[in-house]
């Protein structure tokens, strides 16, 4: 092989190595972003569950107050 062909081959190999290195760095960045987004999703799910529990509790309280109010209104009508 001539020196010129060898240099071209070496340049192509170096370019391939550089491309692979950049892609590996991009993969690592995407993995980190994916992990971050996964944590955000888990946090949002946890918050949603808490809000659903609180909503159910408040609905139960509202129902209790409505029953009491109906009972009081019933007593007032009796008087």
UniProtKB/Swiss-Prot annotation:
GO terms of biological process kind: division septum assembly; FtsZ-dependent cytokinesis
Entry superkingdom: Bacteria
Protein name: Cell division protein ZapB
Function: Non-essential, abundant cell division factor that is required for proper Z-ring formation. It is recruited early to the divisome by direct interaction with FtsZ, stimulating Z-ring assembly and thereby promoting cell division earlier in the cell cycle. Its recruitment to the Z-ring requires functional FtsA or ZipA.
Principal subcellular localisation of the protein: cytoplasm
Subcellular location: Cytoplasm
Gene name of the encoded protein: zapB
Record key words, sorted: Cell cycle, Cell division, Coiled coil, Cytoplasm, Septation
Keyword Coiled coil: yes
Leader sequence segment: none
Keyword Cell cycle included in the entry's annotation: yes
Pfam families reported in the protein's UniProt record: ZapB
Assigned GO CC terms: cytoplasm
InterPro entries on file: Cell_div_ZapB
Record-stated family: Belongs to the ZapB family.
Residue runs in coiled coils: 3-79
Quaternary structure and partners: Homodimer. The ends of the coiled-coil dimer bind to each other, forming polymers. Interacts with FtsZ.
